[in-house]
């Protein structure tokens, strides 16, 4: 765990839950409040991660938090090449909350990460650039029942 935290600290400022600037009074888990910040649950404890400036990007796709997590932590530190196919990764939708992340780590995973949500402005910037959003970078509620919108005419 120490080696992993040291590897993460090469690309992120890392603070343990309860350290100055990491956590809100009365809260027991870290939900990122701004772009470029991540929560990490590891070894029964929450950590706050903030990407170091030299690893930020103005590219509309590379600058997304989901890309930063993949390009700066999951790929280089954990060896996750393709998050869509790597069996070591699972995705938990936003409505299930931080307690679900904690539960999964206590049962069958080693670490969990929470991210600040992708904004509509970021999504539009990617579309305007003619690029594609990375896998699992968006979460919208409510979900359409069939995935299609059907409207009866007449």
Q: What role is predicted for each listed range?
A:
Residues 1-154:
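Surface-exposed, charge/polar-rich loops and edge strands
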